[in-house]
């Protein structure tokens, strides 16, 4: 009798409809859930609701991903990409098919696996140079730190302002931008004048090294630098001559105070 009952569950799942189908989406038996995918009454909304469950097996998630009528749906692709049990290969495949701002959604989801969030960011960053300015501005305002940083580094005036105000932007990302060999002057100037970033000690050290940091900012930052950092900056071969002059003046001032 138990065997008949066990067989009845998957069999019922293959043909259920209406309220019964809705109820089976919450079934705990893995075989029943796999059988549901064979049910012709399963629509996109049913599969989307099923994928909201965090206890689904990798086998079931892979079965959904293999089905053309499901993996062509953006809603289902998002859910597969962000699900913690989706095999990585499958999740990455789904990510590559997502629209730009769906990638942003995945990249910002704390519940999505960390490596999938990073992969989503990488895909967005790769698209940034080719995007229209309107989308760049939206990414500057709402994108995760790496994405906002990529837009910031592009140097568009409006994007620079928005990216520096982005709540996800981190000091680490600002420092990576300032470490780039090539960087538009307006980006350096904007960071040096920004009320949040220009007061960060490590950002000030990085700005002192840049050729486009305005002299007034340079003169403001130098007295706050630790002696060791000031000496390190003075020893940089690529330091601009005008900056070197002010650094040496600051070193001389401190030496005179010691005497």
Residue ranges and their predicted role:
Residues 1-259:
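Alpha-helical scaffold segments
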């Amino acid at each position: 009798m138990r065997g008949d009952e066990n067989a009845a569950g998957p069999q019922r799942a293959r043909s259920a409809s209406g309220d019964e189908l809705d109820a089976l989406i919450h079934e705990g038996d893995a075989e029943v859930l796999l059988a549901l995918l064979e049910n012709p009454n399963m629509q996109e909304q049913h599969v989307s609701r099923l994928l909201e469950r965090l206890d689904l097996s990798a086998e079931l998630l892979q079965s959904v991903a293999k089905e053309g009528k499901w993996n062509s749906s953006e809603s289902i692709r998002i859910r597969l990409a962000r699900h913690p049990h989706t095999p990585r290969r499958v999740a990455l495949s789904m990510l590559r098919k997502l629209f730009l701002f769906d990638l942003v959604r995945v990249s910002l989801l704390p519940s999505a696996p960390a490596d999938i969030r990073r992969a989503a960011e990488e895909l967005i960053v790769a698209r940034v140079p080719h995007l229209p300015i309107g989308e760049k501005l939206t990414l500057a305002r709402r994108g995760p730190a790496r994405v906002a940083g990529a837009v910031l580094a592009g140097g568009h005036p409006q994007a620079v302002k928005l990216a520096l105000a982005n709540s996800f932007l981190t000091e680490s990302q600002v420092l990576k931008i300032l470490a780039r060999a090539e960087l538009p002057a307006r980006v350096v100037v904007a960071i040096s004048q920004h009320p949040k970033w220009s007061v960060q000690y490590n950002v000030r050290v990085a700005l002192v090294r840049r050729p486009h940091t305005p002299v007034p900012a340079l003169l403001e930052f130098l007295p706050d630098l630790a002696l060791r950092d000031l000496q390190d900056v003075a020893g940089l071969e690529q330091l601009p001559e005008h900056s070197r002059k002010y650094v040496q003046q600051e070193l001389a001032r401190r030496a005179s105070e010691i005497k």
